[in-house]
Design a protein with these regions (language model features):
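Charged, glycine-rich intrinsically disordered N-terminal tails and low-complexity linkers that flank
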Residues: 1, 176, 229-233
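Non-transmembrane functional regions of envelope-associated proteins
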Residues: 2-216, 245-270
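Substrate-access "cap/lid" subdomains that shape
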Residues: 202-242
Length: 270
């Protein structure tokens, strides 16, 4: 009797592994979380968060782009080697400050964010070298670009944080697939800005994407979809008042309430 039960029991236990059921997948992810160790900062980056008090002092958000231009210039004067704005500028500034902001962006390597929206519009694929077949990648349904005068003076990359099955973010795409090619992520564009290059290399295999590479830097291994597991790093932070940015690439975000959504991760909200 017991022998007759063994096979059905084994089949039942194996089914979640075969079909990757939700509980099994969550268990795998939680196990991964427990094994991940916090990494030491590279020393190359600093985060500058626009705070609630900054927004209040300037009468609301978004700031006029003349103000953003001044922030950019101040950062460069304090020794920043580049600036990444984790925000998009898809519409003209109602105060007419776009030309001033564009000029400030040209003073140092600068990166602007783009965001997904199902508009069926995509940036032109440029500076992309593919070794292998065009397979793998996460398709996007549309992207909102920055206005021409700003993107002509900067890099622009897509900022997206797709969640895993338990609604936590662990993997970030380093690029996304468009109908006519590829568009690099915000992080990939920062690497290009830091090295002063206009191109990157995608290497694929039979299963999908294998790695991406930016000249002068080691290749970055990805999963088949072009995603990189996040390495948790307690990156140094500064403020508009302190501006401790000498020798760093500055990534500008905001912690002010209601401006940008927070991202849930295994280590808390970002």
């Amino acid at each position: 009797m017991h022998k007759r039960l063994i096979l059905p029991i084994l089949i039942t236990l194996a089914l979640p592994l075969v079909f990757q059921s939700t509980p099994t997948e969550i268990l795998k992810l939680k196990t991964f979380d427990a094994l991940v160790k916090e990494q030491q900062p590279s020393g190359n980056f600093v985060i500058l968060n626009i705070s609630e008090s900054d927004v209040r002092e300037r009468g609301g958000f978004p700031f006029p782009r003349r103000d953003l231009a001044q922030i950019q210039v101040d950062l460069i004067n304090e020794g920043a080697i580049g600036v990444g704005w984790s925000m998009s500028f898809s519409e003209a500034d109602r105060f007419g400050g776009d030309d001033v902001f564009a000029q400030a962006l040209s003073f140092a390597p600068s990166v602007l964010a783009m965001f997904e929206t199902p508009n069926g519009q995509y940036p032109q694929t440029v500076g992309t070298v593919i070794k292998g077949n065009e397979v793998g990648g996460i398709p996007t349904q549309g992207i909102v670009e920055n206005i021409d005068v700003l993107k002509e003076q900067s890099y622009q990359g897509i900022a997206t944080a797709p969640v895993d099955i338990d609604n936590l973010v662990r993997r970030i795409p380093l690029l996304m697939k468009t109908p006519n090619g590829w568009t690099p992520s915000f992080g990939t564009e920062i690497l290009k800005a830091l090295t002063g290059t206009k191109s990157y290399i995608i290497t694929t295999n039979d299963n999908g994407i294998q790695e991406i590479a930016v000249r002068h830097l080691p290749p970055i291994a990805t999963d088949n979809f072009g995603r990189k597991w996040i390495s948790w790093v307690d990156t140094p932070q500064t403020t508009l008042e302190e501006m401790k940015v000498a020798g760093k690439f500055v990534i500008i975000g905001t912690t002010a309430n209601g401006i940008m959504p927070q991202i849930a991760t295994p280590v808390g909200l970002l």
